[in-house]
């Protein structure tokens, strides 16, 4: 069975990119078709003080996306850890394809957070068995390393089921890594905040200093 034609959009290298950064209509989650040629991509951990940034990429067909929506799939930030854990195997089963990518703390400090996040997204997309015809990117900025067709969607994880699925998989995997790393780097409370800059985390940094996996480029203003 052949692929359905992708949504019409312009190449992101064109200054007059159609759809990039535009706020979607309320029912966009229903108006963007899910099929083999469309992948949703999202990142997790961009604003953390510790650890890598993760990205997920998911390709969903319409019927499978509808089943996941009935199971409560939405933006990962709106879901409890238990609910995300329940959804991950369902997403893996229903997705036409999915992939994960990450950029290390060293890459974040060397490249900067935006290029490192884009690299994680690119790696997630490269893990898909087939190159998608269209990539839906969460946010208002284009994915610069991606040379194919793409569309940036503000609050995309609330409006595209493929992006929502990507955010759930990425967050669940990153949080699981933070749980393991909390044993290697005790005292920072990583098991509680997953590396975000909470009051507990900042107090621990002042007391213990940064670990090998803290983002030095994020801590300069905080620690001096």
UniProtKB/Swiss-Prot annotation:
GO terms for cellular component: cytoplasm; ribonuclease H2 complex. Residues 36-224 form the RNase H type-2 domain. Pfam families: RNase_HII (PF01351). Endonuclease that specifically degrades the RNA of RNA-DNA hybrids. PROSITE patterns: RNASE_H_2. Manganese or magnesium. Binds 1 divalent metal ion per monomer in the absence of substrate. May bind a second metal ion after substrate binding. This is Ribonuclease HII. It catalyses: Endonucleolytic cleavage to 5'-phosphomonoester.
């Amino acid at each position: 069975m052949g692929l359905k034609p992708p949504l019409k959009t312009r190449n992101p290298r064109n200054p007059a990119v159609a759809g990039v950064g535009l706020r979607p209509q309320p029912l966009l989650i229903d108006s963007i078709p899910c099929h083999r040629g469309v992948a949703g991509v999202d990142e997790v951990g961009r604003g953390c003080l510790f650890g890598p940034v993760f990205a997920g990429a998911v390709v969903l067909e319409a019927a499978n996306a509808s089943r996941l929506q009935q199971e409560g799939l939405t933006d990962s930030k709106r879901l409890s850890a238990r609910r995300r854990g329940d959804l991950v195997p369902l997403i893996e089963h229903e997705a036409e394809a999915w992939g994960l990518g990450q950029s290390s703390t060293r890459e974040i400090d060397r490249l900067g957070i935006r290029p490192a996040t884009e690299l994680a997204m690119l790696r997630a997309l490269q893990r898909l068995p087939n190159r998608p015809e269209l990539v839906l990117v969460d946010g208002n900025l284009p994915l610069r390393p991606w040379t194919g067709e793409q569309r940036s969607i503000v609050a995309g994880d609330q409006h595209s089921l493929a992006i929502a699925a990507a955010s759930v998989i990425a967050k669940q995997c990153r949080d699981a890594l933070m749980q393991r790393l909390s044993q290697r780097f005790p005292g920072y409370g990583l098991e509680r905040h997953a590396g975000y800059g909470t009051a507990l985390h900042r107090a621990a940094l002042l007391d213990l200093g940064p670990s090998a996996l803290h983002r030095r480029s994020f801590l300069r203003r905080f620690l001096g």
